[in-house]
A protein has these predicted regions:
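Extracellular glycan-recognition surfaces and repeat-rich motifs
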Residues: 1-12
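Activation corresponds to long, low-complexity, non-globular regions
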Residues: 131-137
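Short, hydrophobic/proline-enriched secondary-structure or compact coil segments at domain edges
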Residues: 10-15, 106-108
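Internal, hydrophobic beta-strand segments that form the core of beta-sheet-rich folds
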Residues: 104-114
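Short, surface-exposed loop/turn motifs at beta-strand boundaries within globular domains
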Residues: 6-8, 35-39, 103
Length: 137
């Protein structure tokens, strides 16, 4: 898939609405306390291909039963389908929503039970606070 001006630069994810599903990045636990105390954020470059039909959550996972989960539905619902956009979510918002940022094992989790089709080119940490948001829980 070509994404954001880069050939084969993105991945498309689809949820059918037939039950819960998620996409995540997982690895060894990281201590992100310093990042969450500062102005760091999680940056997503995305194209909405089909608007969400249900609650869509963005989370940071910190082990079994541990996460900080935010409602990304309003942000995605405002996007124009087919248009590339960026969103930055403050790491402190995930901490305030319950994530133990001293042991982050999933720095990106996106889940929904509804229909959704979304393409991503970038999922990364950003130190630039400009435009960063804190979605509702």
């Amino acid at each position: 898939m070509d994404g954001d001006g880069v050939q084969e630069g993105g991945r498309q994810f689809s949820w059918s609405g037939q039950g819960p599903g998620e996409v995540a990045i997982a690895g060894p636990a990281l201590d992100m306390r310093m990042l969450s105390n500062g102005e760091a954020s999680l940056l997503l470059n995305y194209r909405l291909d089909e608007k969400p039909s249900g609650l869509t959550r963005l989370a940071i996972g910190c082990g079994p039963g541990c996460s900080g989960t935010l409602d990304l539905t309003p942000t995605l619902s405002q996007a124009t389908p087919g248009e590339w956009r960026s969103v930055k979510v403050k790491l402190s918002c995930f901490r305030d929503a319950g994530a133990d940022v001293s042991r982050v094992s999933e720095p990106f989790v996106l889940n929904t039970s509804g229909r959704l089709r979304l393409s991503l080119t970038t999922v990364q940490l950003s130190s630039d606070p400009a435009g960063a948001i804190c979605p509702p829980r």
